Design a protein with these regions (language model features):
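Hydrophobic residues in well-ordered beta-strands that form the structural core
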Residues: 33-34, 60, 89, 271
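Catalytic cores of eukaryotic secretory-pathway lumenal/extracellular enzymes that build
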Residues: 14, 18, 43-46, 65-67, ...
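C-terminal helical cap and adjacent loop that interface with cofactors, partners, or active-site loops
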Residues: 228-355
Length: 355
């Protein structure tokens, strides 16, 4: 049929992106594409070639670039506030219940049907820190495993499902009733009818969510699921200029948030997303604190991304944050190289140019 619009948004599961994006480009659509592009480097390259041949634009949803918080970090680092950045230390605190929801019980638990967790969860972060520091990656090494969410760690008396008479339920923080019904931050009984409850039921109520826990995948014991992705991973990146990034992704945290420290030749800058605070300590000077309120939806990044995409479609210039396919693929190359390193016992892997 005829083309129906100027642009299309592709937000399906990871392995469906490229098979849907290629025909859309051939049809003449510009694309707003959910990350990750694909767990296959060959597919990523195929999409990039198609975009070039058709002259269409593909913008990848690296939403963190569009947050007021990280835009302020970028402004300070670009102005040389910390000098030349030599060391970056960063952590993705996934959050204990988010790990259980998305990567143990949920859609991204199995890398054979989705993608490695580092690519799914942290191509965001890898893209972000390279952009903030103005760096490109040369080599990577990585360690990590699914060390806890497996049958060996099931407590005594655990059942296969949380509502099937589990004797360990009372003291289990991963209990589905706690996460989806009673938890003040996530439970439907506390009025949380958005994510994650909306994943269990289209119109979340106490009854619809409880029924989903009783019968669906989100009511399974976290120690009795078919998950194979990691629950913690560390990544070391050597940049092309010799500077380094040490990155940790872990599900064993109270909050799901990001924290980073940029250490440079003139000072250090810490970025605490949860507190909404950026602290600059220039050597020998009093510290400066910048407060940036975090908005809803990836700290305001979701709305900022869509705004930037619409402006691009209306003929505006692509802003510095707008992540083109070519730029996005660097973070995919790093994440997939890190996964190769992890599977090879931590051996260093060179980051080859993808295109």
């Amino acid at each position: 049929g005829p083309r129906l619009a100027d642009a299309a948004c592709i937000a399906t599961m990871d392995r469906q992106h490229v098979p849907q994006a290629v025909p859309a480009l051939e049809k003449g659509y510009d694309l707003l594409l959910e990350k990750p592009v694909s767990p296959s480097l060959e597919e990523c390259a195929r999409l990039a070639r198609t975009a070039r041949r058709t002259g269409r634009r593909v913008v990848v949803c690296h939403v963190l670039r569009y947050t007021p918080f990280y835009r302020k970090v970028k402004e300070l680092l670009e102005a040389g506030a910390a000098g030349t950045v030599m060391t970056i230390q960063a952590i993705e605190n996934v959050g204990y219940w988010h790990q259980a929801h998305s990567f143990v019980r949920g859609n991204w638990r199995d890398d054979r049907t989705s993608s490695p967790m580092l690519l799914q969860k942290c191509c965001h972060d890898l893209d972000l820190y390279l952009w903030l520091a103005g760096k490109s990656a040369a080599r990577v090494s990585s360690f990590g495993a699914n060390s806890f969410f497996n049958a060996a760690h099931a407590p005594a008396g655990a059942a296969d499902r949380c509502l099937s008479g589990c004797a360990a339920k009372e003291n289990c923080p991963f209990d589905a009733e706690k996460i989806y019904l009673t938890n003040a931050a996530t439970g439907i009984d506390a009025g949380n009818d958005g994510w994650p409850c909306e994943v269990l039921a289209a119109h979340p109520t106490h009854d619809s969510v409880r029924e989903a826990i009783r019968t669906g995948p989100y009511g399974r014991c976290v120690f009795a699921c078919d998950n194979n992705v990691v629950d913690h991973q560390v990544v070391n990146v050597e940049m092309s200029d010799g500077s380094t990034l040490g990155f940790t992704m872990t599900g064993f945290t109270q909050h799901n948030t990001r924290f980073a420290k940029f250490m440079g030749t003139a000072g250090e800058l810490t970025a605490d997303l949860l507190a909404g605070e950026i602290t600059l300590r220039q050597f020998g000077q009093p510290e400066q604190v910048f407060s940036v309120d975090a908005a809803e939806g990836h700290s305001g990044g979701d709305a900022g991304l869509v705004r930037a995409f619409v402006e691009l479609m209306l003929g505006g210039e692509p802003g510095s944050g707008l992540t083109s396919l070519d730029v996005s693929l660097e973070s995919h190359s790093i994440a997939l190289a890190a996964e190769r390193s992890r599977l090879a016992g931590g051996a260093a892997v060179e980051i080859a140019p993808l295109l």
